[in-house]
């Protein structure tokens, strides 16, 4: 998959927050934020789907290890609106990644790869990044 933005050497440590703010396209079908070691080893594939791949208004999360996808997790909370500015905050520890959505709802996704640092981020789809911050 071609990516709209790729960043490496992030060295995001457990407990640190990655905030991503951007604009959702007015005709959005889906967008993706990938976090991990590299494009073949992702501790989080975060994929809000407005209407894509048979899903509507659903967040699909997954992992990828050595190029092989894991089992998808579907999160029913969906606060994203086409044409809006939105922000997602992601923190992690040895056990879980915690994803805080724009409406304040939080959910956990297991750190299946036991990553101790996140060095890679990629974004693609119907989402234009305005700001990336580390806290």
UniProtKB/Swiss-Prot annotation:
The modification N-acetylalanine is found at residue 2. The modification N6-acetyllysine is found at residues 13, 19, 29, 108, 128. Keywords: Acetylation, Apoptosis, Cytoplasm, Extracellular matrix, Lectin, Phosphoprotein, Secreted. It comes from the Eukaryota. It holds the Pfam family Gal-bind_lectin. Lectin that binds beta-galactoside and a wide array of complex carbohydrates. Plays a role in regulating apoptosis, cell proliferation and cell differentiation. Inhibits CD45 protein phosphatase activity and therefore the dephosphorylation of Lyn kinase. Strong inducer of T-cell apoptosis. Plays a negative role in Th17 cell differentiation via activation of the receptor CD69. This is Galectin-1. The lineage of its organism: Eukaryota, Metazoa, Chordata, Craniata, Vertebrata. The gene is Lgals1.
